[in-house]
Amino acid sequence: MNENNQKSSRSVRFRRFTNCPYAVFRSLKNQVNIGVLTIPMLAVANLNVASAQTDNQAKEKMYEMEEVEVTGSRAPLTVSQAARLVTVLDREAIANAPAQSVNDLLKYAIGVDVRQRGNLGAQTDISIRGGSFDQITILLNGINICDPQTGHNAAEFPVDITEIERIEILEGPAGRVYGTSSLMGAINIVTRIDKQSGAAVHAEGGSYGYFNGGGHASVVNGRFSNQVSGSYTRSDGFSRNKAGGLNADFKQSKGFYQGNYRGDQVDVKWYAGISNKDFGSNTFYGVSSDDQFEHTRKFYTAVQAETKGQNYHFKPSVYWNRGEDRFEYFRGKGENTYNYGRTDVLGLNLNNYVETVLGKTAFGAEFRNEGIISTKLGEPLDNPTKIHGVDRDYDKGLNRTNMSFHLEHTVILPRFTLSAGVIATKNTWDGEGFKFYPGVDVSYQLARDWKIYASYNTSLRLPSFTELYYTMQGYKADKHLKAEKMQAFEGGIKYLTPGVKATVSVYRNHGTNMIDWIRDTSKGEDEPWQSVNHTKLNTTGVEASVLFDFRHFVGQSAFVKDFNVSYSYIDKDKESEPNIVSQYALEYLKHKVVAQTNLRLYSKLNLNVSYRWQDRIGNYTTDGKTMSYKPYTLLDARLSWDAKQYRLFAEANNILNKTYYDHGNVPQPGIWVRAGATYRFNF
């Protein structure tokens, strides 16, 4: 890559060995002078070589993960430096999991609730720590790709799971980092580009007419890298409507291009992606039709840069997202009854940070314009816009602009990290002035392997266009909704070694003006769902997890490579009102248990077994009766042969063939089996 790092290099002279397990790794990118070693010292070193070889890879991987920069603050911090709890799903975890979509993969993250109305991510609501799908920020390479129309479309990722390097999950309010949609946290998906020119192809098939095929090609030429990928997925689905027709079928195509330039003074990255999906919606949005249908299309473009000054860094980015949606409450019954919507989001981020002896200081601004034109959402338009390919117009719309300014300072000492900042934000929609949302994170290393942390953070969320204007088919929106606000306290402890990693955290969230859809069942079946602001909603939660990497203790040939188990508990203290049914705010996972293990059966033959138990609080109505969600257990597994250039796999979800519901009246599929292969080669 021919990078000139002379300005940032420093000399290190080894005079003696230490017990620090990462001493050699920490010398990378530094000029190293080897001091004189006596013969007795060399003899002692030689005796330790054999034992060290069994755990070098585990230590190196742990150090590598600790030094990954994550987006939990405005200035870049590594996992080991971050004062907040940031969960990282690395490439190995992604490859081993019995999952074919990002949505399915996130089910195994303990603080994340994935509620599916369809299979393999056909329609998915993702939330964090008991929040709703509208209360998190979804990012792709650090770019906010949330759809202001509705969080139902937030998981329309224009990139295939095979192109992902890692997924970062930041739990808890992140207003000072991500702005006006990160009320309960953020999920950042980071893609990868091959380091050398090459290509890969994959194909798989399975139950219910499932097929997925795709691949990518990359070209590396000096300082430039370019990679293009694409995939196609389809299935007949697992259910039928009363007339016997398909109502959970889907097909989706994705295309993604990414490139970068690595210069001496600046790095530049650029992206473009598209996702096109059609899927049967069963009874997703109402029980009076069991043959609903939806079409979505998402466009994504972004350009990012970062200067390479020794002390000052400038990180601008500009992006444009477009989302298109067509909803058919009665599938194929005439375009005049369909709902059409198109959102456009244009954003500019200007982030700066300065490194001094006092720490890292970040400051900057963000401008984000969100607009919608629709047949149902918004105010009447003076000049309607023609809908492409249809003899109808977008005759309603709304536009709002959010501007924010942030300031954050981080102090990093050998055993202590403190990060504090504030964001000032203003939106043209509410007509109010700037509001300030502060936050502070602190951590202290008690011993080499023990760290405690605590945080106080605040955030807000503007109502989605659906919450403001969706009035039809049993729904009545309120365009005068207020923005949600959140305060959160969190504390925890971490124990991190190459062989054992454990965390325990406790948090308390205090929310005001929380938005929800509620319905009063005492007023009869015709009473609509109404969007409202709850006065307040308090949440208390506990999360605990432990991972054992047995390769550190017995070497890479260990039969049980690793085992991890996690538990989450949530309690909301707002009492349920008689006859009032909540769609989202008062429906949450009270208990969640996740356990996973990776086994090395023989040579390159590996097995992943994943277990989940979930107990959800909430009610739904069916046939005029109020029903409570029942807890359920799911068991998934993946068997794979992992060679250098190819991989063969077979996997199954819901092996026990359980009947369960994530959303009322929408059953989830039973056992689902898939098998496939991947082949990689270099040019």
Give each language-model segment a name.
Residues 103, 107-143:
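Extracytoplasmic beta-strand/coil segments of soluble accessory domains associated
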Residues 144-171:
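Short acidic/polar hinge/loop motifs at secondary-structure boundaries
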Residues 186, 191-220, 230, 245-249, ...:
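Short strand-turn segments of transmembrane beta-barrel domains in outer membranes
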Residues 235-242, 246-252, 266-345:
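Flexible loop and strand-edge segments within Gram-negative outer membrane beta-barrel domains
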Residues 412-418, 508-510, 532-621, 676-680:
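Gram-negative outer-membrane beta-barrel transporters
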Residues 512-513, 561, 613-620, 628, ...:
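C-terminal beta-signal and adjacent terminal beta-strands/loops
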